[in-house]
């Protein structure tokens, strides 16, 4: 019941029609006195602004129109000719006024009045537009006048009924299903149903003695049902009528304490009815059942009108004479029940202690028992992972049965189609066609260039392809000669002589070549002369030494004669004879050539640039070109790399050149170089570098597309850009055979940005139903990537194939298992009943020998090697029942085989079978209220059991006590009303239920505490010695035969009269399987803590362990005789050793019975001096908290105080807490006193962790005290 808005007016009101933001029209209530005694009457329009957060400011009207009279009623209807509809006002003066709402809102008040008619001789009390024909308006008023007006002819309405009536029509309502039916209610008690079509009365209801009628309302769905209300203070009734029986009301709704003034039946849900009246209250009813759901916040004066919002029934408004119109919701956001649960579960940490309580308004609230009809969806749909939509539709309208349909769904079909096309092209392996298609359809030059470069990489010689892409292609010899001849040569430079005569085609020479080898005509015959035959003689003799040689000439000659080309080279280089040096080097081999080249390049400091390039090429040092060449010549550098770079250095050289281009981009902000850098990174297969550029281009292209897009959505634009990136990366990886070496790393990935895009793209294609494609790209992401791990799990769950599952074991009426998920016992083998003590029953000299094991019984199942150790036997459990000397043969059952599927004992949770207690005999007193009622049937199919390792709703150690939470409803194999087989000679005696091992997969049950709760009281033993009757079962459903026990049976006190063990049944093939032993509660308070709590000591007589379920075909046991011995001998075996904590001294000895406290609870006179600060500080702080805590936390504060008193009792008795713990608790108390809550928490955690045996319920109180004290200023 959240009050959304308040209109500060005493006025009648009407909601605006339509789905727009709701407006309310108000008209000053006739006869009402304002706070300032103003006589002003007006029509006002209010914008509630429910779409904006309330600022606490008082609402102001958006339109106002003064009138000459007050209003009794208002109505607002939609209209085709008027944008915001027409408002009709019923004035006290008898005038019917119509306004155009749109003109009122726009400020045209002078033109807003549509019409003003005065057909009524007195005040108009009520009016309403026809819900099916908005042009028809019914008005009723004084002297029984009832008019029907047509808005197309308002001046000429027609009247219904006779002209002479002394009563007034107080209310009216059009039928919601039959358009021409109208009902009116008068002050004389007449409820008349009119047929407007025939202009006659249809019938008149006997309104229970002609009591005045203040309100009427039709059922929104049933045309024959309506409700009426009486304004009498002595008899405030609401009558529900069915016109098929108009003599008496169908139902009477009683709840108002004074007269009812207004009714409003929700048009969206016929189960909701609002009523308001003179008792200042507004109630919500279910008129179909007569049940009152609850009441809304009470006001200070009469509530004379209440109305549902016609379009959004979540809101309604109520007008009262306290000068306010309250707009509120039908449901509260936080009910008292929810608040109580929240209070119990609140952690009480920090400022949350008060924050939550202070935000809850102290108002009445209630919660609807079922969802309103407009929230009951007849259909629904939800998006499922993997491009699926799950929809739910009714099989047939009006039925509750639904059908579920799963259909594929794609946000953008183009995305799915392009994904399929690309994946198919990849499977075919035609990468070149993909590149050509993408390059042809590229939106930008950069994208086109990328695809061209990738296409070049696909060629047989990628380097040659890259050089050709840059424009460096191989040339023929003639083309090279032509270009060389045209390098700036106009005339031959021949020292002023005319050019030599051409020597035929192909004789074009460079001027330098010509000057070097064209010195004399004899030079042409030089080579031919050298090639003379062996015997030929020439006429060109020469001297090796002619006497004019220099020393250098002589040295070179001698070296050549001796074949010492290296020495000859040294002399030539020393004399700077480079031409001779190169000729000698050619003869001397590669070593000499390298030496000559090195000397040559060292001398060419002022030589042309190509010499330095040649030096880098010859010296295989292209790094000089990469790092030092001007970036305007990056293409030439790249061509040189493609031509001369070694394979192992090529990628790094391209990477270095690309880095230089990126630095230039950052320095000059010239993004045109980005394409050049991308080329370098592509050529060098540097995926991490090129991906960064592509992602940046993706964002820019996406932004441009958003600015120019006409019909595309932002999602489609983004996905197309993302898909283009993924396609380029995928093709590039395949072409370059890229290997990601960082997939095993856990962080700091170089391709982190690409991994994010892979994950995003996988999510997109998965949304379009391509789960396999999504899985392929997720496999490219490192395994340790957190987001990829989540995405992989989703894909894995969505694509997993259903596996054959073992069906749950079910039992037929004869107890034969249909399936075998569990090891079964022999159907003809006697079953053993539950015994909390692991010792066997003592043999009886009168009992026959136990039957031998059936040779055909299945072998015992092996013990589960992975199960935890069995729970320690409860030291307070009764011993095994003694063998009955009168038991029939076969009563003693052999040991049952171990169930490998049963949950291991010793955990905090182990389900056991339901174990009812047999009715006491021999005059034993009846059981307390804590004993569960007997079951109604014993042939229920076993429920599945979830082991403690897989259960998800296991209770925690500090949860609510057992019994506070509702147990889950058990599943039944048979109806609840099925009769149980008779297992007792007395018809009213409680039957017992067989105890069997729970099958796997059953719902989790509650834990069995090791110490049972105290009995609710003891009663004297009954005097009747006849067989007692069973405890009558309550209205609760039959208990689950596999639910856990609410408590473990305590041990009988020595000296107390025992209850004889029930007679065991003989072997039967229909007995249920044996039960599991109950586990001990490792979270129960220690024995010392139990000793300090007097509530845990008193125990009433305890029933014996339950017996196996009786078979309807087994022989009936003999009736308990009153002459039987009152106390058969009890035999008890030695107590078993505890196994709950192996290896510790405390767990290997039997815990003694709790000792009686030395001093009564509440006594504080014996607290030692070293512990006195604990008591003084903690109790004082607790009193401070009590005085400042909000009332909503009263329960938590009292619980903390009670637990602290347990601590003080231990301190007073000097038990449980050891001296070092007392010292630590004193330090904790001083820390709380000093407001050092972190230190207090640290001490608390240390005690709780390392000294568990000294902790009890008081530790929870200390923890809560720390939290409360910190939250309390």
Swiss-Prot record:
It comes from the Eukaryota. GO terms for biological process: COPII-coated vesicle cargo loading; endoplasmic reticulum organization; protein transport. One of its GO terms (cellular component) is endoplasmic reticulum exit site. Pfam families: SRA1, WD40. Residues 1140-1150 have a biased composition (Polar residues). It is a peripheral membrane protein. Residues 881-900, 1010-1052, 1061-1080, 1126-1137 have a biased composition (Pro residues). Residues 488-509, 796-829, 881-1168 are annotated as: Disordered. Residues 798-817, 943-952, 967-981, 1084-1098, 1108-1125 have a biased composition (Low complexity). The keyword Signal does not apply. WD repeats lie at residues 5-47, 66-109, 119-159, 164-204, 208-251, 255-295, 298-338, 382-407. One of its GO terms (molecular function) is structural molecule activity. Keywords: Cytoplasmic vesicle, Endoplasmic reticulum, ER-Golgi transport, Membrane, Protein transport, Repeat, Transport, WD repeat. This is Protein transport protein sec31. It comes from Aspergillus oryzae (strain ATCC 42149 / RIB 40) (Yellow koji mold). The lineage of its organism: Eukaryota, Fungi, Dikarya, Ascomycota, Pezizomycotina.
């Amino acid at each position: 019941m959240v009050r959304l808005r308040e209109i500060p007016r005493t006025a009648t009101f009407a909601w605006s029609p339509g789905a727009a933001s709701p407006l309310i029209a108000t008209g000053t209530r006739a006869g009402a006195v304002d706070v300032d005694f103003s006589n002003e009457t007006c029509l006002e329009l209010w914008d509630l602004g429910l779409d904006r957060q309330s600022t606490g400011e008082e609402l102001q009207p958006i339109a106002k129109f003064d009138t000459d009279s007050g209003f009794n009623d208002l109505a607002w209807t939609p209209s085709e000719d008027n944008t915001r509809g027409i408002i009709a006002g019923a004035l006290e003066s008898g005038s019917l006024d119509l306004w155009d709402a749109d003109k009122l809102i726009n400020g045209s008040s002078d033109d807003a009045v549509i019409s003003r008619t005065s057909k009524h001789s007195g005040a108009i009390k009520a009016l309403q537009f026809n819900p099916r024909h908005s042009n028809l308006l019914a008005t009723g008023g004084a002297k029984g006048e009832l008019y029907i007006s047509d808005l197309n002819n308002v001046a000429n309405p027609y009247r219904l009924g006779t002209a002479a009536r002394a009563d007034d029509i107080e209310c009216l309502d059009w039928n919601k299903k039959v358009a021409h039916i109208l009902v009116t209610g008068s002050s004389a008690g007449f409820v008349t149903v009119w047929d407007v079509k025939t202009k006659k009365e249809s019938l008149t209801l006997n309104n229970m003695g002609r009591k005045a009628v203040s309100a009427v309302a039709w059922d929104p769905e049933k045309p024959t049902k309506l409700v009426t209300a009486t304004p009498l203070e002595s008899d405030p009734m609401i009558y529900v009528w069915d016109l098929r029986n108009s003599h008496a009301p169908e139902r009477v709704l009683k709840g108002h304490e004074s007269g009812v003034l207004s009714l409003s039946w929700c048009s969206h849900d016929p189960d909701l009815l609002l009523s308001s009246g003179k008792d200042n209250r507004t109630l919500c009813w279910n008129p179909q059942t007569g049940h009152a759901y609850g009441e809304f916040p009470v006001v200070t004066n009469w509530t004379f009108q209440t109305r549902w919002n016609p379009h959004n029934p979540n809101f309604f408004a109520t007008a009262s004479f306290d000068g306010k119109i309250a707009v509120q919701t039908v449901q509260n956001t936080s009910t008292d029940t929810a608040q109580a649960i929240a209070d119990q579960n609140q952690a009480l940490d920090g400022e949350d202690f008060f924050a939550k309580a202070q935000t809850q308004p102290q108002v009445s609230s209630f919660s609807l028992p079922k969802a309103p009809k407009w929230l009951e969806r007849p259909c629904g749909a939800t998006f499922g992972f993997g491009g699926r939509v799950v929809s739910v539709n009714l099989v047939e309208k009006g039925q509750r049965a639904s059908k579920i349909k799963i259909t594929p769904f794609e946000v953008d079909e183009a995305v799915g189609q392009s994904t399929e096309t690309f994946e198919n092209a990849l499977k075919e392996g035609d990468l070149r066609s993909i590149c050509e298609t993408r390059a042809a359809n590229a939106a930008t030059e950069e994208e086109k260039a990328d695809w061209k470069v990738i296409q070049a990489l696909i060629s047989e010689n990628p380097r040659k392809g890259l050089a050709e892409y840059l424009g460096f292609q191989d040339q023929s010899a003639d083309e090279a000669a032509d270009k060389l001849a045209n390098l700036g040569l106009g005339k031959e430079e021949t020292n002023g002589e005319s050019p030599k005569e051409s020597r035929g085609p192909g004789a074009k020479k460079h001027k330098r070549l010509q000057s070097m080898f064209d010195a004399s005509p004899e030079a042409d015959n030089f080579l031919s002369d050298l090639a003379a035959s062996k015997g030929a003689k020439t006429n060109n003799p020469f001297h090796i030494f002619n006497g004019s040689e220099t020393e250098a000439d002589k040295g070179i000659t001698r070296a050549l004669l001796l074949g010492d080309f290296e020495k000859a080279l040294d002399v030539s280089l020393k004399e700077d004879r480079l031409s001779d040096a190169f000729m000698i080097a050619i003869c001397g081999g590669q070593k000499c050539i390298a030496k000559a080249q090195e000397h040559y390049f060292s001398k060419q400091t002022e030589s042309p640039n190509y010499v330095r390039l040649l030096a880098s090429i010859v010296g295989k040092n292209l790094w000089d070109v990469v790092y030092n060449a001007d970036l305007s010549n990056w293409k030439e550098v790249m061509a040189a790399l493609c031509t001369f770079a070694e394979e192992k250095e090529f990628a790094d050289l391209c990477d270095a050149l690309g880095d230089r281009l990126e630095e230039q981009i950052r320095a000059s902000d010239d993004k045109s170089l980005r394409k050049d850098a991308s080329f370098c990174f592509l050529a060098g297969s540097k995926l991490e570098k090129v991906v960064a550029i592509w992602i940046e281009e993706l964002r820019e292209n996406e932004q441009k597309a958003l600015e120019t897009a006409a019909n595309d959505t932002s999602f489609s634009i983004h996905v197309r850009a993302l898909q283009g990136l993924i396609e380029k990366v995928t093709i590039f990886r395949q072409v370059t055979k890229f290997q990601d070496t960082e997939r095993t790393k856990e962080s700091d990935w170089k391709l982190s940005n690409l991994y994010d895009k892979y994950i995003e793209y996988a999510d997109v294609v998965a949304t379009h139903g391509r789960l396999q494609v999504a899985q392929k790209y997720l496999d490219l992401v490192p395994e340790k990537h957190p987001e990829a791990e989540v995405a992989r799990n989703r894909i894995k769950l969505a694509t997993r194939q259903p596996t054959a599952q073992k069906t749950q074991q079910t039992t037929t009426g004869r107890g034969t298992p249909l399936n075998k998920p569990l090891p079964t016992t022999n159907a003809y083998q006697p079953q053993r009943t539950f015994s909390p003590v692991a010792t066997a029953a003592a043999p009886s000299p009168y009992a026959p020998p136990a039957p031998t094991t059936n040779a055909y019984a299945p072998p015992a199942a092996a013990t589960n090697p992975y199960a935890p150790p069995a729970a320690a036997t409860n030291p307070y459990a009764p011993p095994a029942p003694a063998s009955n000397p009168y038991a029939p043969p076969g009563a003693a059952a052999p040991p049952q085989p171990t169930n490998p599927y049963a949950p291991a004992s010793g955990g905090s949770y182990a389900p056991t079978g339901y174990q009812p207690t047999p009715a006491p005999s021999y005059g034993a007193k009846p059981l307390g209220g804590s004993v569960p009622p007997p079951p109604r049937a014993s042939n229920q199919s076993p429920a599945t059991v979830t082991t403690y390792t897989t259960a998800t709703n296991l209770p925690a150690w500090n949860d609510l006590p057992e019994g506070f939470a509702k147990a889950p409803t058990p599943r039944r194999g048979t109806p609840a009303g099925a009769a149980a087989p008779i297992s007792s000679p007395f018809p009213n005696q409680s039957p017992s239920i067989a105890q069997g091992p729970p099958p796997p997969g059953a719902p989790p049950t509650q834990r069995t505490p090791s110490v049972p709760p105290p009995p609710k009281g003891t009663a004297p033993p009954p005097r009747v010695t006849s067989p007692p009757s069973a405890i009558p079962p309550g209205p609760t459903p039959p208990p689950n035969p596999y639910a856990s026990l609410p408590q473990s049976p305590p041990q009988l006190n020595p000296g107390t009269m025992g209850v004889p063990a029930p007679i065991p049944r003989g072997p039967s093939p229909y007995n249920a399987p044996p039960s599991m032993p109950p586990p001990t509660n490792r979270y129960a308070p220690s024995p010392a803590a139990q000793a300090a709590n007097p509530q845990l000591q008193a125990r009433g007589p305890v029933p014996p362990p339950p017996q196996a379920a009786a078979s309807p075909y087994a022989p009936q046991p003999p009736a308990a005789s009153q002459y039987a011995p009152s106390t058969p001998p009890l035999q008890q075996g030695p107590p078993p050793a505890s196994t709950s904590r192996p290896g510790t001294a405390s767990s290997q000895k039997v815990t003694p019975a709790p000792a009686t406290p030395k001093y009564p609870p509440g006594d504080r006179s014996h607290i030692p001096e070293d512990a006195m600060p604990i008591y003084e500080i903690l109790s004082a702080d607790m009193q401070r908290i009590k005085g400042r805590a909000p009332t909503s936390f009263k329960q938590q504060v009292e619980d903390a105080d009670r637990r602290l008193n347990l601590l003080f009792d231990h301190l007073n008795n000097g038990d449980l807490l050891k001296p070092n713990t007392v010292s630590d608790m004193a330090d904790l108390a001083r820390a709380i006193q000093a407001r050092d809550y972190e230190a207090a928490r640290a001490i608390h955690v240390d005690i709780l962790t390392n000294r568990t045996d000294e902790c009890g319920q008081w530790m929870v109180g200390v923890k809560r005290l720390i939290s409360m004290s910190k939250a309390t200023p």
